[in-house]
Amino acid sequence: MSTLPPGPSGLPVAGSTLSFVRDPFSTYERWAEEYGDIVATNIAGRTFVMVAHPEHIERILVTDQQHYGKGSFQRDQLGDIVGDGLLLSEGEFWHEQRNRLQPEFFREQLTQYATMMVDETRARADNWTSGETITLNSELQHLTLAIMARTLFGFDIEDAEGQFANTARTISERFNLSHVSTYLAAWIPTPRNRRYRRAMNNLDTVIYDVIEARRAQDDSPNDLLATLIAAVDDPETDLTDETLRDEIATVILGGHDTAALAMTYTLTALARHPDAEAEVRAELDEVLGDDDPTVTDLPALPRLDAAVKEAMRLHPPAYTLFRESNRPMKIGEYDVPEGATLTIPQWVVHHDSRWFESPWEYQPDRWTDEFEASLPEYAYFPFCGGKRHCIGMRYGLMETKLVVATLLQRFRFDFQLPELSFAAALTLQPAEPVSVRVTTV
Ligand code: HEM
């Protein structure tokens, strides 16, 4: 006899929809408290199974990964945006594309990007005047977009900034788990869907312009865009310009908003924890003095590393993963039907007191070698894990640390909101603009 996981019951359509849509974060937490590590529920007619124990998560992402695909829930939501790009593609096609793109994220390449990252950060910060209030999350989103455009696609974002303005946020909002329409098709003409359509059109225009300009260029830089264009132009492959568009959209959307959030949450956490901030500043003074940070400095900055790691624990930019079982599976003692949508919430696991003492406190000091050695593998997984782990993990971590270090060397950030609150969009968005006053140090 099959044993389904426990979970909240209710009318089949409304099911758990209302409470979840009202507040996905506390609903996830409540389910974990009431029903345990594996919880089944029905949201807008779809079976969701939340899995929140590191051992089960490891089975899904690593040991049994061949039985869990990216799934129809994610494809319905994101298929339009990222198409057959790396995030959603599967099987042999995914494997070949991953191998093709991976070298762009190797250590030697990253070293070349580091200087551009610091240069772009300085240029952005030069626009800030001491004493003014800025919207930190938007500033950092523009910055990471500019960094990505320059390092991976060799173009200057200023040419396209107008078209890009708010694109990522609009697209991320379309996925907001707190809106009933997220569970409905994107073609239904709600105002949010219309904004989303416009953002998508802008994104496509920019991407196709960039491809065209690069093809017309005589001496192309040796970057991710060059690698992708060479693959499409290679008669041995049957890749098309559409594949190219999908990979570019995937990298842009997967890579800049997440990194901007990691930076936002690190800087706001430090601004609210003066002791932790003082330790990071003292370390930067000692190791860097007035010099710009370089990639070789990073291993000498353990406090900065812990500050970022802890911010990504407390506020994981990708706050939940989704997978779909492609055959009936057993998770722990429960049966999970074929086609169930699994939700694997970093939000719950990173705040679980079984793994993290005082889980809601920002405590960078917890990240000692002994603590890390004692932590179950999948109690902390801001970049996912297994074969589908984030291809941009090293890039994103390096970028976050270089940007945070460069900004702290120049400014003090005074957080202007009473609290941070969050929206469960595609990524963990701040619910309100993050206003901070910047003062030159
Ligand atoms: C620093 C912040 C970042 C975070 C928190 C983050 C998080 C993640 C997570 C959780 C996944 C797995 C998604 C899933 O399996 O459903 C992922 C995948 C991915 N990320 Fe990131 N990411 C970050 C930065 C980046 C950067 C900088 C890039 C590109 C430059 C990038 C590109 C991608 C791509 C292409 C995938 C799909 C990989 C595949 O399935 O083969 N990410 N990321």
For the regions a protein language model found, what residue spans apply to each?
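Conserved cytochrome P450 K-helix E-x-x-R motif and the immediately C-terminal K′/meander segment
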Residues: 17-36, 291-332
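N-terminal membrane-proximal hinge/A-helix region immediately C-terminal to the signal-anchor transmembrane segment
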Residues: 1-96, 111-124, 143, 155-159, ...
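Conserved cytochrome P450 K-helix/beta-meander segment immediately N-terminal to the heme-binding cysteine loop
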Residues: 66, 322, 344-371
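Short, small-residue alpha-helix embedded
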Residues: 258-271, 403
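Cytochrome P450 I-helix active-site segment
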Residues: 5-10, 114, 118, 219-226, ...
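Cytochrome P450 heme-binding "Cys pocket" and the immediately downstream C-terminal segment
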Residues: 274-276, 373-375, 393-429
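Cytochrome P450 heme-thiolate monooxygenase catalytic core
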Residues: 70-75, 93-94, 109-261
